[in-house]
Design a protein with these regions (language model features):
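Extended, low-polarity transmembrane helix blocks
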Residues: 1-54, 66-84, 88-148
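Interfacial juxtamembrane loops and adjacent helix segments
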Residues: 56, 60-61
Length: 148
């Protein structure tokens, strides 16, 4: 069975990329990249290490207005989650859990806060779904500790 030279050439290139990049590198970059997005967001909600600001509480009260949640509680939960889960992702520890938690947070933001920002939220969901489905990869504490 003969194949077209372009197809054969592309198959060689694709195989080389797969060997050179590998899924483990893709998972590492996904973990670090999405962790940075959420960690930076968390830093905007606090002063010092983890003191939630009045501005953050005000945003949850006046702009975000999440249903069923007290704004002070929501601001604290978001600030702490945006520090803890990115740290877990960066370390590759409890990766699937952290990815699902941030995916849930993304869904809440999309549904209740900024429904028109779906392109941004989709760009967050993509690496989070990859990490939830495939785990943290070889360069992680999950792997070092033989966690799934």
């Amino acid at each position: 069975m003969s194949t077209h030279p372009i197809r054969r050439g592309w198959t060689v290139v694709a195989a080389g990329l797969e060997r050179w990049l590998g899924l483990d590198l893709v998972l590492l970059v996904s973990r670090i990249g999405i962790a940075a997005v959420f960690f930076q967001s968390g830093r905007t909600k606090v002063e010092g290490w983890l003191t939630v600001t009045g501005t953050a509480v005000g945003l949850f009260r006046d702009e975000y207005r999440l249903p069923l949640l007290d704004p002070t509680l929501a601001a604290h939960a978001a600030a702490y989650a945006e520090h803890l889960f990115p740290l877990l992702l960066a370390l590759g520890l409890c990766t699937r859990f952290a990815a699902l938690a941030l995916l849930g947070m993304t869904a809440v933001i999309e549904i209740f806060v900024y429904p028109d920002a779906w392109p941004t939220h989709l760009s967050w969901a993509a690496p989070l779904l990859l990490l939830a489905a495939r785990g943290s990869g070889r360069f992680s504490l999950d792997r070092a500790m033989a966690l799934p």
